Amino acid sequence: MSILARKGNLFSKPGRGGQYPILTVEGLSAWYGELRALFDVSFSVNPGEVVSVIGANGAGKSTLLKAMTGMMNRGRTARIEGRIECQGRRLDKLRTEKIVETGVTMVPEGRMLFQRMTVADNLLVGAHLPHARQVAAEKIEEVYAFFPRLAERRNQPVSQMSGGEQQMVAIGRALMSLPSVILFDELSLGLAPIVVDDIYAKVREINRSGVTCLVIEQDTRRALAVADHVLVMLEGRVVLDGSPSELSREEITAAYFGTLKNRGH
């Protein structure tokens, strides 16, 4: 299946591994009122990678995603400082609807679907860009080919579907906007292990089609299994980063729980 990922200009400055990153976060800090939630977070994502961000509750993962998708720019008390770029465009000052236009979209925790609407109508919500509307009919058929179960239930309300099927709808909706980058937030939450395995197999398939993926996940085993690169967050900071082959499970576990000793970085 062709996911129809859009193309774009990359940065002129090489990043990790000497590659030109598609997504860069530099010196990102975030506050909710006086409470600081992120502390100078910096990392880059290369084109075509799956990067997994691991951390316990309260590590700052959700705030990171909110910052990357414009949600920290909505309220009066939440604010961010730093720089977020995708394909040469600044994201840190944009609201959510404008960020989607840059090719970045998200599959949110809890899926956030319209429960009374049909599968087809939920998918079409993702085709809200002018160029996407023109290819919506073709695109939705590609999504159905990718998720055959959705094709069988296209006219049924989402409320009648299982959690795994709803997760498929949420991923399909993200694909409808022709993304170059998809941010996945806690895909395993509330799902049976066998269903999660199927969902992550689909994430890898999406990635192989050319879509760059950033995966937020508490389940360390699954995050490592899908990732080309791993970031571990603790108390609003990135405390460990590297490829699964570079990092030992002991190091990752220690970083996750805050007991990692200095690695000499």
Can you annotate each of these PLM segments?
Residues 174-175:
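ABC ATPase C-loop
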Residues 79-89, 136-140:
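Conserved ABC transporter NBD signature motif
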Residues 69:
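Helix-to-loop junction immediately C-terminal to a conserved catalytic motif
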Residues 72, 83-98, 243-245:
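ABC ATPase NBD Q-loop/coupling interface
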Residues 54-56:
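The feature captures the beta-strand-to-loop junction immediately N-terminal to the Walker
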Residues 33, 72-75, 119-138, 146-148, ...:
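ABC-type ATPase nucleotide-binding domains, specifically the catalytic core motifs of the NBD
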